């Protein structure tokens, strides 16, 4: 005959239980089989740690290529981010000439600012007040949205 060992919980005066409520050392009872370090290593480059703050001393390589060009030997080549934006602009039909790239970005920016200023200056008309008009009478025979009836004759 086998016996079941019963464990005591956290309080030695409590009643017997077949569950361990907390491991003897305290904390988590999840173990991977090896000793884990007491503190988590601090990551230097967190993605969302400093979105609008001061720029870091060593920004990641993708940030260098998307922002201002570095003084390295890559001044003549376009960055991958620029090529992606060109392809998306070309597919939208707004940007077809790839040679005047710098001028086009400036024109788009000034056009956007001009449109934004015009939108801010326009007064928003008040919502029209619905007049108490009786709704149109519902016809006795309704057609489906396609306009053709599904009624089969003869």
Curated annotation (Swiss-Prot):
Belongs to the JUPITER family. Residues 125-138 have a biased composition (Pro residues). The modification N6-acetyllysine is found at residue 148. Transmembrane segments: none annotated. Modulates negatively AKT-mediated GSK3B signaling. Induces CTNNB1 'Ser-33' phosphorylation and degradation through the suppression of the inhibitory 'Ser-9' phosphorylation of GSK3B, which represses the function of the APC:CTNNB1:GSK3B complex and the interaction with CDH1/E-cadherin in adherent junctions. Plays a role in the regulation of cell cycle and cell adhesion. Has an inhibitory role on AR-signaling pathway through the induction of receptor proteasomal degradation. GO terms for cellular component: cytosol; intercellular bridge; microtubule cytoskeleton; nucleoplasm. Keywords: Acetylation, Cytoplasm, Nucleus, Phosphoprotein. Residues 1-154 are annotated as: Disordered. Induction: Negatively regulated by the microRNA miR-132. The modification Phosphoserine is found at residues 28, 31, 71, 87-88, 92, 131. This is Jupiter microtubule associated homolog 1. It comes from Mus musculus (Mouse). The modification Phosphothreonine is found at residue 54. PANTHER family: GEO05313P1, JUPITER MICROTUBULE ASSOCIATED HOMOLOG 1.
